[in-house]
Amino acid sequence: MNVVETLLVDNGSLAPAATLQLRALAKAVGKAVGVEVTPVSLLHSTGVSTPALGDVAAEILEPALELRLMQGKMDFLIVPLFFGPSGALTDYMPKRIAHLRESFPDLSVKLAPVLFQPDDDRLARILADQVRAQLREETRRVAMVDHGSPVRAVAEARDQLAVQLQKLLGPAFTVAAASMERREGVEYDFCEPLLANLLRKPEWSHGDVIVAMQFLLPGRHAGPSGDVAQICDDAEAASGGKLHVYQTGLVAEHPLLVQILADRWRRGLVLGPGAKVL
């Protein structure tokens, strides 16, 4: 029986901290499931200098698979560090694997389920914990923000996650889903509202607001000086001092994420609900 190689795959980032945290996650998931889990990015991360990564170069998916295929390894399980079925998983990744299969016809790849699943509220529990950690005396408004996706199914997953978060926080809170950014065109209106616009609405532009970060790893968008932080700073400035925004930590900082990923690994291994063959 061939040994299945497990890869934990994120989208990739030019921020060293993202790759370092991906590695820590892979190690923790590996410990939880009892196998080695290799951290790999879909793209981008090989642009990070090796010294910034502890002198261990980052890997991206296609070369990482090709290297292992040349070593005779043919069976892989990819655990996606993605909230929903983004184009990276439904379009780009299958095309790259099909390309590799032209040279390695015995290549076998299973894709575990994405993080958000309607029957699992643990992502919402992570966000709820992080919201409570930022509570101020009068804080009852929560803007849950993701990157914003051109894929409707990803936006729908975000909206369902916001409903779960609302249920966990209770009726004393108001939870609104928002996007950091979106593409132009009415066909992408499902991404609305943008966080920048939400924080300028009369009912959101004063007092304390918590921005719940539906982001996994630090990088250009998330973190102390990321795009979301700039949006929040701009909204505070536009309010003339009436608005105070508090950002939560990132999802990967919460220990429950390791349990979720371990369960996605188990489901992917047996091709359970949400898993598929690429």
Stretch-by-stretch model annotation:
Residues 1-278:
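Extended amphipathic ligand-handling, pore-lining, and cofactor/metal-binding catalytic surfaces
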